Amino acid sequence: MALIESGGVIIKAQDYKENDKLLWIFTEKMGKITAIAKGAKKSKSKLFSLTHPLCYGDYLLFKGKGLYRLSEGKIRTSFQTSLTDLEKLTYASYLCELIDISLQDEEENFNLYKEFITCLYLINTEAISYELLIRAFELKLLKYTGYGLRFDNCVFCKNKLSVSNYISLRYFGGVCDKCPKEHGLYINKATYNALRFLNNTSLDKVYRLTLTEEVKAELFKVTSFIISSVYSRKPKSLEMLKFIKE
């Protein structure tokens, strides 16, 4: 069996048999993987503290014919404050679900991995509006999984766009005044500019943006529609996010 060491975050965990756990880990080197942690349900197990959701650590895994098997590891951070605060937990769980639905097993995506880790740290620090942070992450998720939105040129005629009031949800980008408006959404021009800013700006800089509630609602409408359309299933956490917003 091959022995592999990689950083990673537990995005989902499930009890398996009497004492074991199944883990879904977003790793730096292998992408999203499924692993079994033998005996991890026992509180005295060396794997017990390593196998909780949102645990970020360095993991040593064996790769056999089937599942990976977790051998040992070392915690970098467990993002524990996210587990005790409902709002933080909901947003962090949503991030994990996005990773789960957007990636195939063992599909390496280092750029997305870096954005994911950064976003979890920023949620934990409370330094930035969670809502803006999540919208920015959604746009980067779309970009790094092949569905990035285009804002600088019309998706149809390719003419340069300074701003637009229409997003094509089929072709993932802005539409100029001369091209047909179909299979998309009319939005405020301020929303268009906000989308472009969040798409192009690093996550730790999105705090610079101040938006009205109308623009925030339109941002959510655009990203949630596309995410629900292009991936394997609609994120269940979206409903909880709507509940928190209300």
From Swiss-Prot:
Top-level taxon of origin: Bacteria
Q: Which SUPFAM superfamilies match?
A: ArfGap/RecO-like zinc finger (SSF57863), Nucleic acid-binding proteins (SSF50249)
Q: Which UniProt keywords apply?
A: DNA damage, DNA recombination, DNA repair
Q: Which InterPro entries match?
A: ARFGAP/RecO, DNA_rep/recomb_RecO_N, NA-bd_OB-fold, RecO, RecO_C
| Any Gene Ontology CC annotation | bacterial nucleoid
Which GO terms are recorded in the biological process aspect for this UniProt protein? Answer: DNA recombination; double-strand break repair
| UniProt similarity note | Belongs to the RecO family.
> Under which name does UniProt file this protein?
DNA repair protein RecO
Look up and give the organism this protein is from: Clostridium perfringens (strain 13 / Type A)
The taxonomy runs:
Bacteria, Bacillati, Bacillota, Clostridia, Eubacteriales
